[in-house]
Amino acid sequence: MKKIISLLALTIIFTAALAAQDATIYLWRNIKGMEKQPSVMFMHKPVEGSPNTRTAVIVCPGGSYHHLGLKSEGNSTATWFSQNGVTAFVLKYRSAESLYHHPAMLQDIQRAIQLVRENAEEWNIDPNKVGVIGFSAGGHLVTMAGEFWQTHDEIAKLGIPCSVSLRPDFTVPVYPVVTMQDDIAHRWSRNSLLGKGKKNQTQERKDEFSMELNVPADMPPTFVVVCDDDPVVIPENSLRLYAALQEKNITCHLAHYEWGGHGFGMKDCPFMDEFHWNEELHVWLKDLGFME
């Protein structure tokens, strides 16, 4: 009897897991020379009965560009968006843990944006309502997506035909890595992105990948989240980005909290119970026409 109950419990857990994730999309399937690349994104469709926003968001977990917090920052975020009528795609992008550095990560997020837009009709998505949200190093990645969609078109460099824009419609960097400058850079993320050593980390490259130095005039609307007590990424990263966005008159918002630390994502925790930062994001996205 105990064995039957255990098997039933496992079946329920497995079924719930399947229900939460609707499809696995391989980014580089059938792309010559890229077929063996492991990058995938996990699709979470809007929950039945939720608003028909036709908005999509690509979720980029953090992990210092070395590994990925798929569960803590990826799945919890995708669940919240899907409950609010947004199709979410958790991006498992390549990282230094598997010996990948730039441009692998940027290739992956640009390819993800391309695939979402190219399949928008099939997936009930408005191609003009495709945003990105990222945490920590993932915050740097989504900011790159917002800044580099023209200057660093990795899809074109690979010779892949693309008839859609690679510009996200909104960008949400959460406790993000922003700068590569020596004074406040998150060194692990910098090493993972650029590679170690002076040859890989020239001042020119540090400037190129410092997001606060490269905000374009057509940067997407950006919502930045930061906590003063962040023990991992120095909060000044977010403040520099926000100042740069304001200087360029970009539509932006700074969700600035006294405490909360780092790595909370959208999972249940004391910080979320106290501040509900995702509800502040909800209001902002609603005002822009991306949520209801």
Region annotations inferred by a language model:
Residues 53-62:
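Short beta-strand element of the alpha/beta-hydrolase
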Residues 61-66, 228:
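Active-site glycine-rich loops that stabilize anionic/oxyanionic intermediates
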Residues 30, 176, 180-214, 220:
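Mobile cap/lid helix-loop segments that gate and shape the active-site cleft of serine hydrolases
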Residues 114-185, 206:
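Primarily recognizes the serine-hydrolase "nucleophile elbow" in alpha/beta-hydrolase
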Residues 44, 225, 236-292:
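C-terminal catalytic histidine-bearing segment of alpha/beta-hydrolase fold enzymes
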Residues 69-71, 76, 91-127, 270-275:
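Catalytic nucleophile-loop/oxyanion-hole region of alpha/beta-hydrolase
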Residues 224-226, 230:
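Short beta-strand/loop motif that positions the catalytic acidic residue
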Residues 21-52:
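N-terminal cap/lid segment of alpha/beta-hydrolase-fold proteins
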